[in-house]
């Protein structure tokens, strides 16, 4: 059975801010664009956490709900909520089959929660996932290094626009959000 998938999510910590950007394309299989304006970046826990997903849409929504529940349970502690979600993800037979990845961030931490329950905090404050993730990551690293005067939001938007120019599964209908 074909699934709805393909997207790019990019996040960066820079100059005291964190920004996250996601495109709006939802693809059915490898041949049909079903939606151009999906919102894959959201605020969670009283607006203090940014979260973005890539992968199967239904699976990602399930993970959003689970992660939001963990944030509430652990009073907004991003790292603890991520660890507890990862534990549950690895142990639960149904969750283990979910095909999605998430980037979550608050002002202090930026984390990747992978499809196999791994949690990764980048050394350089930049993460990208999805079909255009490699392109966005390369652009973001270059901008953060060689254009440090840009803000986190500008880096996130430019990185995702670069990915959209290259990746057929990424479009220019961006949602960009920032925590200062």
Swiss-Prot record:
What Pfam families is this protein classified in? Proteasome (PF00227)
Biological process (GO), any one: proteolysis involved in protein catabolic process
Stored InterPro entries: ATP-dep_Prtase_HsIV_su, Ntn_hydrolases_N, Proteasome_sua/b, Proteasome_suB-type
Keywords for this protein = Allosteric enzyme, Cytoplasm, Hydrolase, Metal-binding, Protease, Sodium, Threonine protease
Q: Where in the cell is it found?
A: Cytoplasm
Q: Which domain of life is it from?
A: Bacteria
The reactions it catalyses are: ATP-dependent cleavage of peptide bonds with broad specificity
Q: What is its main location?
A: cytoplasm
Say which enzyme class the record assigns.
Answer: hydrolase
Q: How is its activity regulated?
A: Allosterically activated by HslU binding.
Q: Which GO terms describe its cellular component?
A: HslUV protease complex; proteasome core complex
Name the positions where Na(+) binds: 164, 167, 170
GO MF entries: metal ion binding; threonine-type endopeptidase activity
Active site located where? 7
Q: What's its EC?
A: 3.4.25.2
Matching PANTHER family: ATP-DEPENDENT PROTEASE SUBUNIT HSLV, METALLOPROTEASE TLDD
Q: So what family is this one in?
A: Belongs to the peptidase T1B family. HslV subfamily.
The protein's role, per its UniProt record: Protease subunit of a proteasome-like degradation complex believed to be a general protein degrading machinery.
Subunit comment for this entry? A double ring-shaped homohexamer of HslV is capped on each side by a ring-shaped HslU homohexamer. The assembly of the HslU/HslV complex is dependent on binding of ATP.
The record's annotation in NCBIfam families points to: ATP_dep_HslV, PRK05456.1
Quote the protein name from its UniProt record.
Answer: ATP-dependent protease subunit HslV
Q: Which organism is it from?
A: Brevibacillus brevis (strain 47 / JCM 6285 / NBRC 100599)
């Amino acid at each position: 059975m074909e699934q709805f998938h393909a997207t790019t999510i990019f996040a960066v910590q820079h100059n005291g801010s964190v920004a996250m950007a996601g495109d709006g394309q939802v693809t059915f299989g490898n041949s049909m664009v079903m939606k151009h304006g999906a919102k894959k970046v959201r605020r969670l826990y009283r607006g203090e956490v940014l979260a973005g997903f890539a992968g199967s849409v239904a699976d990602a929504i399930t993970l959003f709900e689970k992660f939001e529940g963990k944030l509430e349970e652990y009073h907004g502690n991003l790292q603890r909520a991520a660890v507890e979600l990862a534990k549950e993800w690895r142990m639960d037979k149904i969750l283990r089959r979910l095909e999605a990845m998430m980037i979550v961030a608050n002002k202090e931490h930026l984390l990747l929660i992978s499809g196999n329950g791994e949690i990764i905090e980048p050394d350089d404050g930049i993460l990208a996932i999805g079909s255009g993730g490699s392109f966005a990551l390369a652009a973001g690293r270059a901008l953060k290094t060689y254009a440090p005067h840009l803000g986190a939001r500008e880096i996130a938007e430019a990185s995702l626009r670069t990915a959209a120019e290259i990746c057929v599964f990424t479009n220019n209908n961006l949602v960009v959000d920032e925590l200062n």
